[in-house]
Amino acid sequence: LMHTLWPRTQALNFKFSWFPSPLYLDYDERLAAGRPRTRYAIDDYEGMTFWLALTVEQALPKRLQTRWPDWLGFAVGYSARGMHGANVKSRGREREYPELPSAHPEILLSLDYDARYMPAGGWLWEEFKQQLNWLHFPAPAVRVYPDLRFYLLYL
């Protein structure tokens, strides 16, 4: 609705990325050792990152738009680590790990690719590209909180 009422807001999009965390990948080993774990990908919150992506070209003044690649943008990401129930406020089934550090957020800055600018095709391909644009693809990134860290490819 916001994009329809205010077309300039189309320069902002929400995106999602996921890369399996050790809580998910090492489930069997963690289960045997009695350590925090998650069985299902949908519950692997440590592996998820949520992004607010800016389509830079749409946000630039008209005279500068020709100098910026259509498909390249920036994104701000939010993720969390330590989501294993160690926090005192945790009510989850894994709350019995008080010796582990509490969860903490991570803030990232990254390049972003706009899938809508992939080569043209038929109507089905065009619809597919629109759906791909909900995903944040691996790209260089910098974690700015809680500390500074560079990722050649943030998955």
Predicted regions and their residues:
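Hydrophobic alpha-helical membrane segments
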Residues: 1-155
